[in-house]
Structure formats: structure tokens, C-alpha cells
């Protein structure tokens, strides 16, 4: 995968990018994102080119063109997603990882995980934020970057209310399959976040 030309303009984000940098849990899919660099830029995914390259490395079992800017593939049992985000990138320093594979940095991943809480309540996102905080990233840095990344549609008060409401998150059997290194409950994560906010 790291040698594919189609990933050059994208960064690997999400759980897999975090796992490669911190090793706090396994991840199952490869999420690639690119962001707007100018107001006039058309945010599209060149799915035809991507598909041609993915077909070389494995069997394309499923394709889902969700929109002009978002496509997902299942290649030999591995989920790939490519998303051209209309926002500006939260990543100031991409991590050069291997060949053409570049990763979003840990702080940016944390901010994106916080921003996605507007749309979903996955325990793995809550766990990842906990892992990032445990690694020493200050919570105020994450909150500030998340608010900026959301275009300030996310308000500090609302984000902190979401982060300190562990009842939204349930650690399930599926999460256990990801071999998390921290044996924490949602309540323990909430308590730690409150401690970080003191």
C-alpha cells in the first residue's frame, strides 16, 4: 500500500494512523483524507485511478461511491476509504512514515476524533482520545484544534459536555477484538478527562 501513487496527495488518518504511531490498539481499516488548500479547489476523489491501483494489490470485493468526494473499497478483506474533505487541514506537520505513506500527527487525529463526536458516539473514539491524553498531549491543545477544525460549529461548552458524558459510550465485544492496551471503562475515561481539565 505504501508504494501506491494514489495515496501521495492523501494522509492516513484515524485509528490506523494512531496505532502506527502509538500502538494503543489495533485498527481494521485504512482511512485516507485530503483537505482543501484554496477556496476554489474542487474537492473530488479520483476513484477510477485509485481503483486501478488497488486492483493490483488485491481483490476488490466491494466499491461504494458515497459522493464525488468520498469512496470506500473492500480489498481482500481490508476496508479502504478516500475522502476529499471540504475543510482546511488540521495537520500542520504530516508524519513521513514509509515510501509514499504519510500520517496525520497524533494531535490532529485527536482533534478529528473530537470533531467526529458531533456525528457518532463510538467507544473507540473515546478510547483514542484517552490514549492521546495519556501520551502527554494537553487536552486544551486538542480542544482548541478541534474547535478550529470544525469551523467553530463546535462550541467549547458542547465539546466538553460530550467528552465528560461517558454514558454515550459503551465498550463492546467488537472493541475488545482490537487488543486495546488500556483496560479502561467509559466512566474511567470520563474521570481522567475531568482530571485533565482541572
Task: Label each region the model flagged.
Residues 1-198:
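Compositionally biased terminal segments of proteins
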Amino acid at each position: 500500500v505504501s508504494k501506491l501513487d494514489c495515496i501521495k496527495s492523501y494522509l492516513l488518518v484515524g485509528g490506523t494512523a494512531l496505532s502506527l504511531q502509538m500502538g494503543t490498539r489495533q485498527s481494521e481499516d485504512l482511512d485516507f483524507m485530503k483537505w482543501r488548500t484554496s477556496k476554489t479547489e474542487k474537492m473530488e476523489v479520483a476513484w477510477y485511478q485509485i481503483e486501478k491501483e488497488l486492483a493490483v494489490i488485491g481483490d476488490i470485493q466491494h466499491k461504494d461511491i458515497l459522493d464525488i468526494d468520498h469512496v470506500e473499497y473492500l480489498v481482500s478483506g481490508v476496508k479502504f476509504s478516500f475522502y476529499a474533505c471540504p475543510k482546511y487541514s488540521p495537520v500542520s506537520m504530516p508524519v513521513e512514515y514509509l515510501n509514499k505513506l504519510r500520517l496525520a500527527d497524533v494531535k490532529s487525529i485527536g482533534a478529528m476524533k473530537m470533531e467526529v463526536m458531533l456525528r457518532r458516539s463510538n467507544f473507540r473514539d473515546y478510547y483514542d482520545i484517552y490514549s492521546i491524553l495519556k501520551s502527554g498531549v494537553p487536552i486544551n491543545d486538542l480542544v482548541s484544534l478541534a474547535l478550529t477544525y470544525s469551523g467553530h460549529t463546535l462550541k467549547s461548552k458542547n465539546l466538553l459536555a460530550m467528552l465528560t458524558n461517558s454514558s454515550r459510550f459503551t465498550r463492546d465485544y467488537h472493541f475488545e477484538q482490537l487488543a486495546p492496551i488500556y483496560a479502561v471503562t467509559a466512566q474511567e475515561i470520563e474521570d481522567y478527562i475531568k482530571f485533565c481539565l482541572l
